[in-house]
C-alpha cells in the first residue's frame, strides 16, 4: 500500500502538470470568441440549466451512469479531466474525471453524470464521487473527519471555486433524491461508499459556495445524524475509521515485528556459537 500511495502521488503530479499545460494553452486560445474553451463553458452552462429546468428527471441511480454527457476531447481537453478537487482537511488533491466508470475511479474522483457540471453558479449541485481507498491510495478514505465549515476547493478549466461543508448525511445507494439540485444554491456534494469495506450505505458531504459575509456555523445534519457543528462532533472513532487505521498501519507493524524476530534470531544464533 505504501508503494502504491507513492506511485499514485507521482502519477497525480504528472497528470496535474499536463492538465495545467492544457489549461494554459486553451486559455491563450480563448481570447477568440469562438474558441473551444469558450464553447465548452457555454455548453456546460447550458447543460446545467437544462437539468435544473427538467428537475433532473433522468437521474434514477447516480451510480448507473458510467459515461459522461460530455466528450472533452472534442474541445481539446485530454483524458476527460475537467479539473481538480482539493480537500485540505483530508490532505488530498485528486483529478476530477467526467464519467463514473471503473477506470476513472481507479485514478481519482469522478463527476456523477446527470448532476451539475463543476463550473458553479446558482441552481447547481455537482456531485463528486471517489472510492474510500483504492490499492492503498487514500482518495476519500478519511471523509469521516470532515466537519461543518471545512473548505473544499474545485479548480476547473476557468477558475477556482471555494465551498464550505454545510451538511453531512449517511444515505442508501438508491436515495437519488438526496443529491438533487437545491434551488437557489451553488453546491458541491462529495459521496463515497460506507461503511469502509462493507459499502452498503453512502457517506455524503454537502458543500455550499463561499460568500464573503457568510458565517459557516450553526448548521444541522438531517437524516442519519453524523455531526452538527465543530463543537458537537463526537470524539469516538467509527467502525470505518478503526478499519482504516488498521489497514493503514498494519503493514508497518508487520515490518517492525519481522525486524524484531530477525534481531532475536541473530542474537540467539550468536549465543549458541
Label the model's feature ranges.
Residues 256-259:
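Conserved PLP-enzyme active-site core in the AAT-like
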Residues 1-251, 261-269:
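Solvent-exposed, non-transmembrane regions of membrane-associated and secreted proteins
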Amino acid at each position: 500500500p505504501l508503494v502504491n500511495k507513492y506511485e499514485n502521488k507521482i502519477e497525480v503530479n504528472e497528470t496535474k502538470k499536463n492538465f495545467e499545460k492544457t489549461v494554459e494553452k486553451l486559455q491563450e486560445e480563448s481570447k477568440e470568441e469562438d474558441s473551444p474553451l469558450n464553447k465548452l463553458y457555454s455548453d456546460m452552462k447550458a447543460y446545467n440549466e437544462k437539468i435544473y429546468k427538467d428537475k433532473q428527471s433522468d437521474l434514477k441511480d447516480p451510480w448507473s451512469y458510467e459515461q459522461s454527457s460530455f466528450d472533452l476531447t472534442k474541445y481539446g481537453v485530454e483524458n476527460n479531466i475537467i479539473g481538480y478537487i482539493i480537500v485540505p482537511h483530508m490532505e488530498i488533491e485528486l483529478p476530477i474525471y467526467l464519467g463514473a466508470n471503473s477506470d476513472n475511479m481507479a485514478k481519482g474522483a469522478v463527476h456523477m453524470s446527470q448532476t451539475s457540471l463543476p463550473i458553479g453558479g446558482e441552481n447547481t449541485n455537482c456531485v463528486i464521487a471517489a472510492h474510500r481507498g483504492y490499492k492503498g491510495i487514500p482518495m476519500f478514505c478519511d471523509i469521516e473527519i470532515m466537519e461543518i465549515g471545512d473548505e473544499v476547493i474545485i479548480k476547473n478549466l476557468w477558475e477556482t471555486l471555494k465551498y464550505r461543508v454545510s451538511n453531512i448525511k449517511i444515505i442508501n445507494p438508491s436515495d437519488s433524491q438526496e443529491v438533487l439540485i437545491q434551488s437557489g444554491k451553488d453546491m458541491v456534494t462529495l459521496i463515497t461508499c460506507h461503511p469502509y469495506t462493507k459499502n452498503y450505505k453512502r457517506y455524503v458531504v454537502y458543500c455550499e459556495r463561499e460568500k464573503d459575509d457568510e458565517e459557516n456555523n450553526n448548521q444541522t445534519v438531517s437524516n442519519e445524524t453524523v455531526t452538527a457543528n465543530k463543537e458537537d462532533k463526537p470524539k469516538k472513532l467509527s467502525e470505518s475509521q478503526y478499519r482504516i487505521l488498521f489497514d493503514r498501519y498494519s503493514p508497518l507493524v508487520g515490518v517492525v515485528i519481522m525486524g524484531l524476530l530477525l534481531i532475536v534470531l541473530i542474537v540467539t544464533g550468536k549465543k549458541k556459537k
